[in-house]
């Protein structure tokens, strides 16, 4: 073992993902999940050396605090504690305040809490995780890595909304973007695959999972992205609507819908689930399509068409074009969805490598198509956000 391990924590509103990452290799030495926090069946499971274990979480204290407290004993029991040099926290929203990874102090934690209005489901939970980890691991330096940070290089023309200026100056309403850590990682890996310096490489990165976003990366920097002020905008997703005429919200309110009902529908009952009337899972959509389900077929078409439209529009943001990167659970594994997206981009001249597309699944990277017209490639690259968090934490030691 080397003294290069980082405990990476991703604290959700009712869950806690954790991993001990080797910051040199990117390997997850230990990985686990705490879930159902706040409920009677709260539990915590982990995987170490191929063996899985699960325990119940009981007690009157915060379940986040209890779970992170148990990590102290667990890392000692597994012989990992002495090699952990830092704790890295994934924080969803850094606003305009945090443009890069920072070492956590009380002031930083308070600033993260102040940004709760911009990410009410995520930032309060992130701050709870930070406070619990600082108490549990007082001797370890701790760092915050922000999903929004990579997108802080967007030019003003990309992040500015066409709205009254005071909505930005008074309320901070602008495009922030998310999945930044993922887009950052895969763009660096893509540059290595095509043997070019990242500073001279330009890609359109497509992160497709239950949440989904596209990012235009020009000479290694984010210059535009599909998610905006919140993770609700942009692409159609598992249960989220993506881009929508805002007049629809007023229309539904006038029809007697409550604000809560409107936004619950747009966040939790739209996307794949809403269009198909069946499921939010892309695998279920594809299976139902094969059985002739019309709603599933329509959801597939709407989803892939919208991704293709975003890719095509982001060519306007680039000075050159080296390729498209597919990542995220769907992007890394769904051959039919990748194929349909590239098929829609027929004017770009991508020719599928059928074997390459079949092989680039289940954790395997690869080239799945090439455009002789543009000299660009379509790549599949598994994301590794935890490794980025570990690396950026170690860099600040």
UniProtKB/Swiss-Prot annotation:
- What is the protein's given name? Acetate kinase 2
Summarize the protein's role. Catalyzes the formation of acetyl phosphate from acetate and ATP. Can also catalyze the reverse reaction.
Site feature Transition state stabilizer, where: 179, 240
User: Record's Pfam families?
Assistant: Acetate_kinase
Locate the residues binding ATP.
17, 207-211, 281-283, 329-333
The reaction(s) annotated as catalysed by this protein in its Swiss-Prot or TrEMBL entry are: acetate + ATP = acetyl phosphate + ADP
> Which keywords has UniProt assigned to this entry?
ATP-binding, Cytoplasm, Kinase, Magnesium, Metal-binding, Nucleotide-binding, Transferase
Enzyme class, first EC level, given as a word: transferase
Cross-referenced PANTHER family, in alphabetical order? ACETATE KINASE
Q: Which SUPFAM superfamilies match?
A: Actin-like ATPase domain
Native organism taxonomy:
Bacteria, Pseudomonadati, Pseudomonadota, Gammaproteobacteria, Vibrionales
Which residues are responsible for catalysis? 147 (proton donor/acceptor)
